[in-house]
Amino acid sequence: MSKLNMTPREIVAYLDEYIIGQKEAKKSIAIAFRNRYRRLQLEKSLQEEITPKNILMIGSTGVGKTEIARRIAKIMELPFVKVEASKYTEVGFVGRDVESMVRDLVNNSVLLVENEHKEKLKDKIEEAVIEKIAKKLLPPLPNGVSEEKKQEYANSLLKMQQRIVQGELDSREIEIEVRKKSIEIDSNVPPEILRVQENVIKFFHKEQDKVKKTLSVKEAKEALKAEISDTLLDGEAIKMEGLKRAESSGVIFIDEIDKIAVSSKEGGRQDPSKEGVQRDLLPIVEGSVVNTKYGSIKTEHILFIAAGAFHLSKPSDLIPELQGRFPLRVELENLTEEIMYMILTQTKTSIIKQYQALLKVEGVEIAFEDDAIKELAKLSYNANQKSEDIGARRLHTTIEKVLEDISFEAEDYSGQNITITKELVQSKLEDLVADENLVKYIL
């Protein structure tokens, strides 16, 4: 399947494999992502004039808001970051400032580009790693030896490399030089402080950045892979490409946008900093320049997708300027009992398939009767109605409860085929779901 140039129809067909229903949401987002590709095909002067149409997704938790955006960004290999609006504070308050979401996007973009470059050089990196380990295992060739000896050494080296590739020497130990583990730097601090931190770390580690370690050949492969990757990759080019890609095709998903809306019903009881966060967010969404450790990035061509349940507030409770920056609005449907059943049976990587694969590792074959699946869907739906509606996430907890004993005693069932029946599902869940006081314990 093509990547960046996927058509809206192809995008929706791909999403249908993983997410049931939500046709309108899929359609709107597919068009928005396709427009990213269309814009990049235009002349530079016209590209600058076309800004993305940001999207506001309205729907309860667990109905697929995040999953739709995340799946598209993944298949199209676009820089993507998901953040929660409620985690940010107004400038001047203790907490994360809104610009850090752009810095997170750039970090993800650089990592994405780096992994792509590593994949292209994969064979070259592996060859260099194998050769280096083989030379460590073979005694070095003395100076001034004959051509015949040199040829013998080359043949021995080749045989040694073949044995390393086949894993025959994985348990052998060798001494290699590896780079010291770098100190973690908090990427949420302002770029100026980041640069100072990096310079201080470089200064103190310059002379003693490598240490000798005795590792197994298997461990050495991984350790050397990272080192050789750094020498073969053009770090500066990767940073520049990552910055450029974040700027032209980055996607920021802002969840819980409703948590910073100031509800007119609550009036003065609302946290005054909520409106402050909205005002800080406004220039980022409108288009501004944000400094990152990789350089400056303009935000006007980043696609922003905001999402929220809006149970206690309305989209109109957001400040008017911010509302105007999210012109496309999509309402997602709540999950019905039928959709719950389809999620369990029709998605490509359904929860049932996941649990079957996990237990197969222990040699346990699990099969679900259709009536059992329908009962799971029914009881999960009922739990959502009686308690807080958490959408498809409820299915995880109900299935976990049904399979709890089998998972715990998996070694006792090894080599057996187990069928999950409607009666078993009822015995594990029905009492809990029937008692409204206990529903909350099924999350």
Model regions and ranges:
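Non-catalytic accessory segments flanking P-loop/AAA+ NTPase cores
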Residues: M1-L443
